[in-house]
Structure formats: C-alpha cells, structure tokens
Amino acid sequence: ESLYAGRSMDGSQFARESLGLRFEKKNITDVIKKIEGQVNYSYNDHIMDNFSLRTPPLVEMNHGGMTMLMPNAMAMQVTRRTLNSRLAMTSEWNKWSLITGVDSQFNKHGGSMSSPTMPSMNVPYRQDMRFQSYGAFGELGYQWNDQNKLVTGARLDRVTVEDERADSQAKGFNTKLEKTLPSAFVRWENQHPEHDLKSYIGLGYVERMPDYWELFSPKHGNAGSTNTFNGVNPEKTLQLDLGFQQQHGALNTWASAYAGLVDDYILMSYHHHPSMGMDGHDMSHDITAGAKNVDATIAGAEAGIGYQFTDRIQADLSAMYAWGKNTTDDKPLPQISPLEGRLNIRYVADKYNLGLLWRAVAEQNRVSLHQGNIVGYDLKPSKGFSTLSLNGSYNLRKDIDVSVGIDNVLDKTYTEHLNKAGSAGFGFASEEQFNNIGRNYWVRMSMKF
C-alpha cells in the first residue's frame, strides 16, 4: 500500500513480476573482444482507489427530483507488460574501438475503472496502448594519443505506438503513430597526467518519443489537433556538455556543465477542462493537463571539492544549478530545480562507517504557474530550506550489512520545489503543495547471496 499525498487516489494493491536472462562471451578473436546479450521481461499491476486508505469525496446525485450527497468511491487498475532485448558486439584493433548492436522494446498498457456508488462509470479492463521500438546503434572510439581520445556514436530507432482506446476508434481518429528517431554524439576526452586532470567536451543530438502518459493522459494536444495522441510531436534536443575531474593527493575537484536547445519540448498546462456527464452537466471538479510543444533553452552546472583529512575522515562540498526558458512564450521553463548545495562528511572504518549530510536549497522564483510536465507543475515560487541527516552502517559478516539513519534531524517543515502534487498520469491534479516528511528514523539490512 502507498498513500499519495498529492493525488486523488492511493495505491492500494501492487503486483510485480520480472525475469531476466543475460549472456556474455569474451576474447572471441583478436579483434572481437566481447559479444553480449540480454532479455528482460516485467509485468506491473497497480490498483488505485480513493476509499481503502482515505474517505472518498462526496458528490451530488439527482434521484427522483431529490439531490443527495453520495460518496464518490472510485478504483482504477493500471497494468504494463514490457519485453526488452539487447545484443551488442565490442571490437578493438590498433587505436580503434567499436561497439555495435541492436535492441528492441515492446510494451502493452491497459486498465479499468470501477465505482461502487456509480456503476454507470464502470469501464471493464481493456488494453489501450501497444508500443514497439527497434533500434540499431554504434559507438566508435579512436585513441588519438596517450592523452587524447575521440568518441562518436549514433543510433536509429523505429517506433510504433498504437492507440487501442475504443473512444479513439469510434471517433475515427488516427490510431497509429510511426516515427523514425535519429540520435548522435561526438565527444573529445583529454587526460593531463602531470596535473592529475581528466576533461571532456561533447555535443549530442537526440529525438525522444512522447511516453504513454504524455500521449494518453492530457485532455488535448497542440492547437488544431484532433486529440493528444495525434497532437504532440517528439522532442528534439541539441546539447553541449563539458567537464573535468582532478585528483591530486588528498584533494579532489570536479565540475560539469551543459547547455542545450530543445525543439518541441513537451509542456503541460494544468487548468480546468469541462467533462460532461450524461445529463449534460459539467462533471469535472479537478484541474487536468493539456499538452503542447514549445521551443526551449536549457543550461546547468555542477561543481564540487573533496578532501581526505585522514585515512578515515573525508568530506566533500558540492553545488548544482539548473536553468531553463520557454523561448516560444518567453517564460521560465517550469519544474526546474533551484540552486542546491551539499556538505557530506564521512568516517570510514574497517567494519563500520558514519556519515553526516547537510543540504541547503535556495528559493526558486523562476516559475510558470500551472505549467510543468507529466509529473507535476509549478504552483507558486518556493522558499529555501536546509536539512541535516545522519547515517551509519555496520558490516555484521561478509555478506550482511545493517544501515541506520535519521533524516531531517532538526525536524524542519519544508517543501520541495519539484513537488509531485500533480497527477496528470491518472487524470487529476492537486492545487496543494505538501510538506516533506519530518524527522524520520530508518533501518535497512542488505544481504548478498
């Protein structure tokens, strides 16, 4: 069971199945160094409702000329069946290295809905989406000299998504999307042994197919589209990455940064969408999502410094920042994390270790109200906060470890800016941000077999 603070339903039942098979063969010839393959299968069955773990909301019902308040108890089932496969070969000769391969992914998604108080709302289980993707990829590396290496790669995906909802078929909408999605990158890696320094710079391009929730859950797509399934385009991102890492004695430093241009960024706008009942009245009372594509600019950076004070005491200090702009509407890109800093101090012994984590997060004033992504949206500017956590672990025996910890030691009340209050994935969204957990004690045991 799982209670969702910012959603209209809780997870009352979960069932998961997973199977995996992997093989690897090394040193086949002087050139072919490795052939590897894997197949993974998973099945997830998730039942949500608004009455098992909470009191359902009341709704007005008209019966025989009388208006009554009835509990609006609802339950939904969501299932996903996934089969993934991958086959790759690694070759090396002289200064060259090459990884080539193919992969595939198959998804089937379905669900149902039931209402004990309003049987007319019942929808029997049926499959609503079929997804399949075939991809081919290659990565070529060339060792220019002892200090420099050039790496480049590309992949091509053929994606097919089928809309199997009865409503889409009845209205004559196009129910099949077929897209060919290219991706490529080039990266220059550099080593400076005299300065204990490694650096890199790279440029990449990727096209991303909208996922299930982006295609199926919003109430509409781009202006002029018949429905969301046919009204949202794949995202296209061109991004520059660069960074370095230096280890010099007890001191280590690192930094990385990125800047990118996104065409057809999938933006969700959360507002009221009328939903008419059988009597012609508006039956919707919640904010739901609409999707559209916009162009965006993104950038960000992360940097840190660490120091080994003694053989057992070490500490590191890091900071990270992200920025985004919706250039189509000349607004901040929503759901961007604020500036954050972390101080991590550790004491490491042979059989145990102790840790302290101090996290400081700045306020976020760059917001776009009621806009976001499929997970959540910007409700308002957020305040800054800081938290302190303690943890430790002890090695009981060779393959058994016990860990304990206290999160939010000072029991502060705070709210993350990326507050997952939106529930577009299930057709609802909340206007309320909820606080993160207060002081929290936890224990975990891990075993290896």
Task: Report residues per predicted region.
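Gram-negative outer-membrane beta-barrel transporters
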Residues: Y142-L150, R158-V159, Y258-V262, H271, ...
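Extracellular loop and loop/strand-boundary signature of outer-membrane beta-barrel proteins
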Residues: L3-G11, R22-E24, M68-Q77, N84-A88, ...
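Surface-exposed extracellular loop regions of Gram-negative outer-membrane beta-barrel proteins
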Residues: D45, G110-S115, R158-Q169, K176, ...
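Conserved C-terminal beta-signal and adjacent last beta-strands/turns
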Residues: S12, K26, L140, I201, ...
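Outer membrane beta-barrel strand-and-loop segments of large Gram-negative receptors
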Residues: M68-M89, M129-F137, N227-N233, Q239, ...
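Face-selective signature of the C-terminal outer-membrane beta-barrel domain
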Residues: F14-S168, F173-G204, Q246-Q247, L251-Y258, ...
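Short coil turns and loop connectors of transmembrane beta-barrels in diderm outer membranes
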Residues: T29-V31, N94-K95, D146-Q147, P193-D196, ...
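Small/polar-residue-rich segments within soluble enzyme cores
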Residues: G243
